[in-house]
Amino acid sequence: MIDIREIQEVVDLGTIPGAIHCPRGMLEFWASPASPYFRDYFQENRRTVVFCAGGGRSVLAVKSMEAMGFNDVAHLEAGFGGWQKAGEAIEDASQTSRWMRKPKDAS
């Protein structure tokens, strides 16, 4: 799952366990193999579920990813808010290193 909310939303509210954070403004850069910002967890033939706070940003992200050639992409219609309201598990972003940037000289 890809969490496209802004970092402050993630820090304030948490996220879905195991989700990868990609701010909406970076999605096309991180998802394009031609981009110098490409992240290898974006694979065109891998099932990808995108979510935001309420479903608005994620539905647009899905359309963008489909236009880029992603074959199996969907969004969480009710967003993180719906996930939270349903009582599903939430991960505190401060408890996992994948939410923290490493200094450029760190290995």
Task: Name each region found by the language model.
Residues 4-48, 56-107:
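Rhodanese-like catalytic fold shared by cysteine-dependent sulfurtransferases
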